[in-house]
Amino acid sequence: MQSIIGKHKDEGKITPEYLKKIDAYWRAANFISVGQLYLLDNPLLREPLKPEHLKRKVVGHWGTIPGQNFIYAHLNRVIKKYDLDMIYVSGPGHGGQVMVSNSYLDGTYSEVYPNVSRDLNGLKKLCKQFSFPGGISSHMAPETPGSINEGGELGYSLAHSFGAVFDNPDLITACVVGDGEAETGPLATSWQANKFLNPVTDGAVLPILHLNGYKISNPTVLSRIPKDELEKFFEGNGWKPYFVEGEDPETMHKLMAETLDIVTEEILNIQKNARENNDCSRPKWPMIVLRTPKGWTGPKFVDGVPNEGSFRAHQVPLAVDRYHTENLDQLEEWLKSYKPEELFDENYRLIPELEELTPKGNKRMAANLHANGGLLLRELRTPDFRDYAVDVPTPGSTVKQDMIELGKYVRDVVKLNEDTRNFRIFGPDETMSNRLWAVFEGTKRQWLSEIKEPNDEFLSNDGRIVDSMLSEHLCEGWLEGYLLTGRHGFFASYEAFLRIVDSMITQHGKWLKVTSQLPWRKDIASLNLIATSNVWQQDHNGYTHQDPGLLGHIVDKKPEIVRAYLPADANTLLAVFDKCLHTKHKINLLVTSKHPRQQWLTMDQAVKHVEQGISIWDWASNDKGQEPDVVIASCGDTPTLEALAAVTILHEHLPELKVRFVNVVDMMKLLPENEHPHGLSDKDYNALFTTDKPVIFAFHGFAHLINQLTYHRENRNLHVHGYMEEGTITTPFDMRVQNKLDRFNLVKDVVENLPQLGNRGAHLVQLMNDKLVEHNQYIREVGEDLPEITNWQWHV
């Protein structure tokens, strides 16, 4: 095909004069990056450096900074030359100064933070605030214009970058991958993400592996293997690597500029060919391996040992602050080596010749709208979830699979948003297993590798489902990148294995918390997580697949951000999920069932229940407005089944016992109103649970979580049954028995907490013990649960 070379404006043409300007710009970025580490005053060294100009405590990092400033300067050139829509994602840890320095130089920072102006006072504030109490982080934190990846917990940069370009055909994400970061599990698997990028409908990712050779105190693996081995590694992963290696700035500027022109034109040519010819075959996308010294341009030796090109450059290269001035002269020499007098005018502003190098307006990477995704967010079109209602003539009379019913609703969400292409489903090869079958009626899995029919199923070059990579890390990272750039989606996975990404969820929650306090950061769509194949539904999976701990992990996070829902049936799930899709800036966790399950609520009942989050189920209660003898509560699908079964036993054997049944769908309702926005007042809580009557609580997760949530409540007569880390491959009911969540143990607990029952209670406890023995004998002989368990029906 015809090349696009020569079809762009001459601006950015590689000449010795232009490269000298880029070098000057790079020096300016390096200078103020060092200044942010050390300086409180005298930011351009217009007088001799003195101890009083220094911070009292120097905190921050240097090693990755100059290499990234080098990359940033050269990306600015190709953005202007090719009129690119590009964002910058930084993966290395502690690279905070990079985007701060560069966004300050191009003016974005001062537009976002007018108090950090482009003059003497602004430059002093810029330096003071870095890693300073009341200031900014040493990472590319949410406060940093242009950032969508903080780089604190490492490994997610490439996944975020791919998520950002899904359905953004004109966007290029320049993703700098640290060579230390490249050793993490999530990053190591992210190189495979190129197998899912459609060159017609998606944008492009340009990975730039920054090989500076060292981590905190160790060499990096990829920097120490032979070049041909490294090249083959990336070629084997489907990339076309270009190497830019060296330490002489003049040579490196020319090589980097030439290489960026080549890879940019390759990307644009790939896209042009794909879009003109509807060619979705997987291309060999280019990438860059940039090998430069760690701490490049910094002190070569400190205290007689190597610094530049050594692990010693990782953090603060020179130990110097207001109280320790032995290295003050060396710091001054280092700062002056950048020749700030050539770079800034008399008003402490970057000289016009260098300002001209930066893109303008939203073409600046720090000002790109995709890096503030809430600005681009469009409301998701959703059908009326009530149209998907399961008919429930009487409680328990209908049996359905909740996730199958949800799949019908999700199918139509996909259909309604086909033209906007702003909704995706992510999962690690579990969409079919998790019963979202109906979704495949309207879309397929996006997959750019070979398709072998009829052996394969539902694979296509273009689809709304991205679930063909068995990596929870990559799926979560893709979804986060997709959300951060202004779209919608959800991640459905096995409950136990969502724990694999619980730390990623934590990091995203931190991002949401901070950005919610920044007026210029607009709210993004919520992170919606569906945890199914849950702890109580094991079948062939067993002990390894049992972990409901994500609930506790979520609860500990900022109450303004996190929500946890445990719908007990399909209508409740539909109402909850629709609600979650319309929230913004939240983490919504839904724990749900996928197996055949009795249905309890009509759609009207479910809507009211979800709106309240917690309610008395009158049809399962017989206290009828009186003070109950006991409250039986449930939270979760299986606990609700067993709690209702326990109620039927109590009604049969102790008909005079006044039982109140309370179901919890919004777990945060259990918290006091001053601890969570969804929390109940003490008055409302006591109206449900009384102040002193025994509460037998059947819970989906670990029992201590309910004790934690209700710690400040008046009624301490609470007895929680939940998961006790017991169970293996066994029958569904035996899982409950082993963890004492079954109906028989619940009834025993009721009786044991009502001593007034006397002999009547003792006989019922004996009957329950007999049933437990019968159960154990039966499953070991027959291999399935007792007929009275499998055929149980709700009745009063």
UniProtKB/Swiss-Prot annotation:
One of its GO terms (molecular function) is aldehyde-lyase activity. Keywords: Lyase, Thiamine pyrophosphate. It holds the Pfam family XFP. Its EC number is 4.1.2.-. It comes from the Bacteria. Its cofactor is thiamine diphosphate. GO terms for biological process: carbohydrate metabolic process. Belongs to the XFP family. PANTHER family: PHOSPHOKETOLASE-RELATED. This is Probable phosphoketolase.
